Design a protein with these regions (language model features):
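Cationic-aromatic interfacial patches
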Residues: 20-75
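Small-molecule-sensing regulatory modules
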Residues: 47, 81-82
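Bacterial Sec-dependent N-terminal signal peptides
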Residues: 1-20
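Well-ordered beta-sheet/strand-loop patches within structured domains
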Residues: 20-24, 33, 70, 74, ...
Length: 368
């Protein structure tokens, strides 16, 4: 049905304007507007057409993207060639097919967007804005042409690994940041996996959540949570020598949780090269993946199937089916470099396509 709708739309667009330069220009601007491309310019000169084509292929940076650690690659030669063809009289229909992404999800969302624009029942302004934002995000992904990409969508609390053509080769539920500690939107690389990681407790969690508990009974609380006290030199400090009455903002130590199945990061951690203390990791509370609302973390991204994800990124089956549950206690952390660092992209698409191929509007708990 989706393909039929797209075919009808494209046929009418081309039939009504074929061979008419003014009509072709109108269709270009109208199509760009329909899929959420801003009105860039008014005259069909080379510079203006180039700007439209660049956004139709590569989109614009999504709103609230806080950090971009991945290099963007835009094929300017391709855009220039398409511009010359358009200005030389090539019909819009043939150019559109070469411009638009062949990603199944993008095609499905484009058809849905066209239906929203002509159907008053479906096409409320909020829905149209949401689908256009998601279409832009998919176009923007074309700037990152790696063989493998890890993509996390915050509203759906899902992670997927896609290939160069956008096909999903792996997916997993995740837990993302809660409204008070949201996961930021960014792009970066995953360079390595840590086996049996320490959890170096963030300062904010130490001050706001842990110190008040520890002060009541330092030895018992630290022992129950497998926490170590570390000084500025990275040395472990005997808790009995610490003045726990020191004001929280002047507390000179950091807390570190020992490795093992009880560690908050679980037994696998995926390092992420960004300015944030944000990474992907296993967890010691896997029951939360069954919840519909998985906006629960302090900002990091907990992965339901970290062993399978690690095997995929490493390129071989290093971790067996029972690896997550048969872990050693107090094992030393070990960092394993990936054969090639993998791009990771954090997005915020309220409207998207789920793993079953259905269009979903997800609970929008916060705006990052």
């Amino acid at each position: 049905m989706i393909r039929i709708l797209l075919a009808i739309f494209l046929f009418l667009s081309c039939y009504l304007t074929q061979g008419q330069p003014v009509g072709e220009w109108f269709r270009l601007r109208q199509h760009a507007h329909d899929i959420g491309v801003d009105s860039l310019c008014a005259q069909p000169d080379s510079a203006c057409v180039t700007r439209y084509f660049a956004q139709i292929v590569y989109g614009r940076t999504p709103r609230r993207m806080r950090y971009q650690g991945l290099p963007e690659v835009i094929d300017s030669v391709r855009i220039a060639r398409l511009t010359r063809q358009f200005l030389g009289g090539t019909d819009w229909c043939s150019l559109l097919d070469s411009l638009e992404s062949h990603d199944r999800r993008y095609r499905q969302l484009t058809a849905y967007c066209m239906r929203c624009l002509v159907d008053d029942y479906m096409g409320d302004s909020l829905t149209i804005e949401q689908v256009q934002e998601t279409l832009n995000a998919y176009r923007w992904l074309n700037r990152f042409r790696a063989e493998t990409r890890v993509i996390v969508n915050i509203p759906s609390a899902m992670l997927r690994v896609s290939d160069r053509r956008g096909n999903t080769v792996f997916s997993s539920r995740v837990v993302v940041g809660k409204p008070s500690t949201p996961t930021p939107l960014f792009t970066a690389y995953i360079p390595s996996v840590v086996i049996y990681p320490y959890w170096n407790v963030p300062r904010s969690i130490t001050v706001r959540e842990l110190l008040p508990k520890i002060r009541k009974n330092p030895a018992a609380t630290l022992n129950a949570m497998n926490l170590q006290v570390i000084n500025a030199k990275g040395q472990e400090v005997d808790p009995k020598t610490i003045n726990w009455a020191t004001p929280a903002n002047a507390f000179p130590y950091r807390l570190r949780q020992s490795t093992g199945c009880d560690n908050a990061l679980g037994v696998l951690k995926f390092n992420v090269s960004s300015p944030y203390d944000i990474y992907l990791h296993d967890t010691n509370a896997r029951q939360v993946f069954a919840r519909e609302n998985r906006q629960l973390s302090h900002g990091c991204i907990r992965v339901e199937k970290p062993d399978a994800l690690a095997n995929l990124l490493l390129g071989y089956a290093r971790f067996g089916a029972d690896y997550l549950t048969s872990c050693a206690k107090n094992a030393s952390p070990k960092t394993v470099l990936l054969p090639k660092k993998i791009p990771v992209i954090i997005l915020y698409n309220v409207l998207d396509i789920d793993e079953a191929g259905a269009i979903r509007v997800y609970r929008s708990g916060y705006r990052p």
